[in-house]
């Protein structure tokens, strides 16, 4: 029996909508990464993007356990000497709640061109509304 290799032309992509309200950030991000990568499908092939599109709503209501709201620090650097910037999770939620989920999922996907392609299929919105009704997304309970 030959090993099955999915071809990018044969892949049928679905759209899923996930409500992040009350969900723990890491657990939510790992499930989203699995769907973006395509590991939930029987046709999963590591070197082909077999994943589906994921829409995340209510990103502002995602939960951090313990004292991470004040103790978790996001680090950014401009590339210039002294160009580092630190921001806590509380400040990140106030400034850009979508970025918390984006960075968590990004860290769980492969690094390189294929991972960047997978990340483009992730759409995150702070509130309950999203502009992707035409794609008829399926509700996904995580």
Curated annotation (Swiss-Prot):
PROSITE patterns: RIBOSOMAL_L13 (PS00783). GO terms for molecular function: mRNA binding; structural constituent of ribosome. GO terms for biological process: negative regulation of translation; translation. Keywords: Ribonucleoprotein, Ribosomal protein. InterPro entries: Ribosomal_uL13, Ribosomal_uL13_bac-type, Ribosomal_uL13_CS, Ribosomal_uL13_sf. GO terms for cellular component: cytosolic large ribosomal subunit; ribosome. Pfam families: Ribosomal_L13. The keyword Ribonucleoprotein applies. This protein is one of the early assembly proteins of the 50S ribosomal subunit, although it is not seen to bind rRNA by itself. It is important during the early stages of 50S assembly. Part of the 50S ribosomal subunit. Belongs to the universal ribosomal protein uL13 family. This is Large ribosomal subunit protein uL13. It comes from Dictyoglomus turgidum (strain DSM 6724 / Z-1310). The gene is rplM.
């Amino acid at each position: 029996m030959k090993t099955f290799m999915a071809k990018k032309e044969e892949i049928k992509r679905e759209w899923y909508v996930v409500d992040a309200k009350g969900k723990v950030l890491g657990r939510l991000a790992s499930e989203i990464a699995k769907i973006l990568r395509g590991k939930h499908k029987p046709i999963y092939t590591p070197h082909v993007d077999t994943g589906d599109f994921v829409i995340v709503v209510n990103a502002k209501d995602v939960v951090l356990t313990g004292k991470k709201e004040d103790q978790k620090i996001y680090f950014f650097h401009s590339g210039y000497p002294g160009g580092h910037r630190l921001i806590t999770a509380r400040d990140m939620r106030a400034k850009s709640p979508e970025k918390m989920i984006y960075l968590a999922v990004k860290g769980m996907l492969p690094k390189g061109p294929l991972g960047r392609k997978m990340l483009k299929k992730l759409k995150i919105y702070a509130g309950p509304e999203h502009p992707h009704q035409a794609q008829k997304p399926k509700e996904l309970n995580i």
